[in-house]
Amino acid sequence: MNPSSAGEIADYLKHGDYSLAVRRTLDYCLDTGDDALIDNAVNWSREYHVNENSKSVKPIPDNFISEAESILQQASKIQSGISYQTKPLISAEKISKTYSGGGFSLKPINVSVNTGNVLGVVGENGNGKTTLLRCLAGQLALDDGEIKYHLLQKPDPYAVKNHIAFIPQRILKWFGLLKDNLHFSASIAGVYGEKNNLMVNFMLERLNLTSYAHLTWNQISSGYRTRFEIARILLQKPRLLILDEPLANLDINAQQTILTDLIFMAKGAHNPMGIILSSQQLHEVEKVADTVIFIKQGDCLYSSNDRSEKITSNAVEFETTVTRETIIAIFGEQKIELQFNGGFYTIISPALSAQEIIGKMITAEISITYFRDITYSTKRFF
């Protein structure tokens, strides 16, 4: 983050976006590296969450705004000298993998990720998303191609494992209290004593997990297990975070919160990192990813990096109660392709823009309950 971010946080506070303001203030203070300021922000955040969980009639604790202003003022003075540059993290060139028996093969594929960037990998189950992620994480040997880990001078398996964190869809069970596991994870990363306590408390607050820290694995839902696993991994400060279907066990609100939080932290000066994630939640991933690739039967059919080369028509997905014949009549002689999957219609046109397609239907005064421009969305390939 940079000093201008203090103004963004002030706007969140002004307009009542308190949860986002708290999360971003914690990020802002973490980037300063000032332990006393971080601790102050953690305590301020804790008061906010206690008030929120108590279902108080007051949306925020007393002195919440004045304390926030004081914290931001202190952080801004330190932040003025902090900056980081985006660096290449990983690049894979024509990597491929075939499992023994020849049942499935990942076709040659190219990907690259820099610090602060997010790569989204989408596709149906069983089409190669997990295989690709495990290859990039160094968990599977390649049949062909090359992976370069740009920040490692000697990318041996041990160095790669410490450089990259991989969170699978099925997370292994934790034993003991959740908070104790986080303390242990921080100690593995060389964080001890008061600094260990500070960073664990910070991560609990940052992901809003403090009220669950005293529980055990069997006492929390699958969604919270995912969030605790993310907290555990982030304490180890990986340079590349790879997540396999992290949204599968989360509700809609938690999905977007986790994604935006990961992006915020990936771009922070404390530990700028790259993120690669797989998912079937296309809309959520496309909103946050810098690059999205679509994999089908082991082959990369689409990458948003070269979308202009493959997309020659515009497409709009929408929901309406009118008939197919009514829709066709609206466009008259203009050439369109109309598809219906039982729930949504899709209009594809090489001549009309998405705005023109929607405009014609609005002018015709037909009822539209949902629409989305999917011209450059991987939704077109499902």
Predicted regions and their residues:
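Conserved ABC ATPase "signature" region
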Residues: I82, H183, K195-Y212
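The feature captures the beta-strand-to-loop junction immediately N-terminal to the Walker
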Residues: V122-E124
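Helix-to-loop junction immediately C-terminal to a conserved catalytic motif
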Residues: A137
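Conserved ABC transporter NBD signature motif
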Residues: G145-V160
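Q-loop/switch helix immediately C-terminal to the Walker
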Residues: R170, G176-G190
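Catalytic Walker B motif of ABC-type/P-loop ATPase nucleotide-binding domains
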Residues: L241-E245
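ABC transporter nucleotide-binding domain
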Residues: F264-I275, Q280-Y345
